[in-house]
A protein has these predicted regions:
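Extended, highly charged accessory segments
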Residues: 1-260
Length: 260
C-alpha cells in the first residue's frame, strides 16, 4: 500500500458546490501489523476459565495500519490517482482521459496501477487469544461485544478503545484467533493495558459483562438473535460490518467459554 506522507494535490477543476452531502463509503479497515520495538507491558500469560485456555498480553508503542480499500489507480510516474470502481479485479488500467502532472504538464505515462492507501499509527494494544480458528463473522461479533463489555467493566469511555482481528498459525499447525483491542488515542492512553494486568477472576468478569450486554438485548428475537442493533453491537464506527455481525454469535461464544 501507499502512504501519502505529504498529503494530496487536488484537481484544479472544482465542481460546483451543492447542498448534497458527500457520500460515505466506509472503506477503512484497521489491521494489526506489530512492531519489533514494541514495549511489552504485561508478559503473555495463560488464564484458565473452565476448560478453556485464554492468553492475554498488553504492549505499548505497538503498530497498526489503517487501509482505505477503495480502488485507487495510481500513476507511478507523477503520482496522479483516481478511483475506478468499474475495474475492481484489474491490476492496472490505461487512462483514456489522459492526465497532467502536479506541474500542469501532460504526463507521458498512461498506465495506472491499482493501489491501496494507508497510514500507520502506534498505540497501546491488548491481545486476547484463543487457540482455535473463529470465522470472521463470528469473531467480529465477539470483538465488538468485548469492546462493549470491557469498556463498561473497566469504566472506559467506549470511543476511547477500538478493536480488530488478527490470525496467526502456530508452530503446531493450529490457528490462533487474536482479538486485538487498542487505544484510539495515537501513542496510547493506557486504557487497554489494564486488560493485560487482569487475573482469571477479572477476565471472567469482563467476559460475563460482554455476555450480559448481548444477552439482555432483544433485537432479532424472531430470528434467534440473527441480527445486531445500536443497543448491543452496532455503532457508528462499525457500519461496514452491520450486515454480518450477529448477537447470537457473541452469545454462543461467551456461553461456551463461561459455562462449558
Amino acid at each position: 500500500f501507499i502512504i501519502p506522507e505529504y498529503g494530496f494535490i487536488i484537481s484544479p477543476q472544482i465542481n460546483k458546490s451543492t447542498t448534497k452531502k458527500p457520500e460515505r463509503t466506509y472503506r477503512g479497515e484497521i489491521y494489526y501489523i506489530g512492531d519489533k520495538k514494541e514495549t511489552v507491558e504485561n508478559e503473555n500469560k495463560e488464564l484458565r476459565i473452565n476448560n478453556h485456555i485464554i492468553k492475554i498480553k498488553s504492549t505499548s508503542n505497538d503498530e497498526l495500519v489503517v487501509i482505505n480499500t477503495s480502488n485507487f489507480f495510481v500513476c507511478d510516474a507523477c503520482g496522479y490517482a483516481k478511483v475506478d470502481e468499474k475495474h475492481k479485479e484489474e491490476g492496472f488500467i490505461f487512462d483514456k482521459d489522459y492526465h497532467n502532472t502536479p506541474y500542469g504538464r501532460s504526463c507521458i505515462n498512461k498506465k495506472l496501477y491499482r493501489r491501496t492507501l494507508g497510514h500507520k499509527f502506534k498505540t497501546d494494544v491488548a491481545y486476547i487469544s484463543l487457540s482455535c480458528y473463529l470465522e470472521k463473522e463470528k469473531a467480529l461479533s465477539v470483538v465488538y461485544a468485548l469492546l462493549e463489555g470491557v469498556s463498561q467493566y473497566l469504566g472506559i469511555e467506549r470511543n476511547d478503545i477500538s478493536g480488530t482481528l488478527h490470525y496467526n498459525r502456530l508452530d503446531s499447525g493450529v490457528w490462533e484467533t487474536n482479538f486485538i483491542l487498542f487505544d484510539t488515542v495515537p501513542g496510547g492512553a493506557g486504557h487497554v493495558r489494564r486488560i493485560g494486568e487482569a487475573d482469571e477472576a477479572q477476565l471472567k468478569n469482563m467476559l460475563m459483562k460482554s455476555l450480559e450486554i448481548v444477552k439482555q438485548c432483544h433485537c432479532g428475537e424472531d430470528s434467534n438473535g440473527d441480527s445486531a442493533c445500536y443497543s448491543c453491537l452496532c455503532n457508528y464506527y462499525n457500519q461496514k460490518h452491520h450486515d454480518i455481525i450477529k448477537r447470537r454469535y457473541a452469545v454462543e461464544f461467551f456461553e461456551n467459554i463461561l459455562y462449558k
